[in-house]
Amino acid sequence: AYIKNPETALVRKQQGYFNYLHGIMLSQTNLIQAEKYFKKAIELGLNMDMDLAVAKLNLAGVALTRRRKLEATNLLNEAKKLDKQNMLKEQITMMKEQMKKM
């Protein structure tokens, strides 16, 4: 079933994941709109460091497309610290390579 009003239907952490998943779906089509959901998810809180790292990595990608290099660098470094199993190592390295070209 579709959640019509997440603020009243879900607890804070669930709202965080609701926004996180919404952001992931939107990142395929509309990065600018996805940015809003990722920021809200981080603000509300996510339980797993991995999820937080993915959200920050996506935000870094948005910052890069908008030519905000400093913000992208900070978000990438935060994502790298949160990525304890090195699952995002390849994506982080790729994004840092793209930054060098800017």
What are these regions (language model features)?
Residues 9-13, 46-53, 81-94:
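Boundary/linker segments of alpha-helical solenoid repeat arrays
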Residues 14-21, 51-61, 91-99:
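"A position-specific structural signal for the A-helix of alpha-solenoid helical repeats
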Residues 28-29, 59, 65-66:
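Structural motif corresponding to the intra-repeat A-B loop/turn of tetratricopeptide repeats
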Residues 30-31, 68, 88:
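Residues in the short coil linking paired helices within alpha-helical repeat scaffolds
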Residues 25, 44, 62, 99-102:
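TPR/TPR-like alpha-solenoid repeats
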Residues 1-19, 24-28:
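N-terminal topogenic membrane-targeting module
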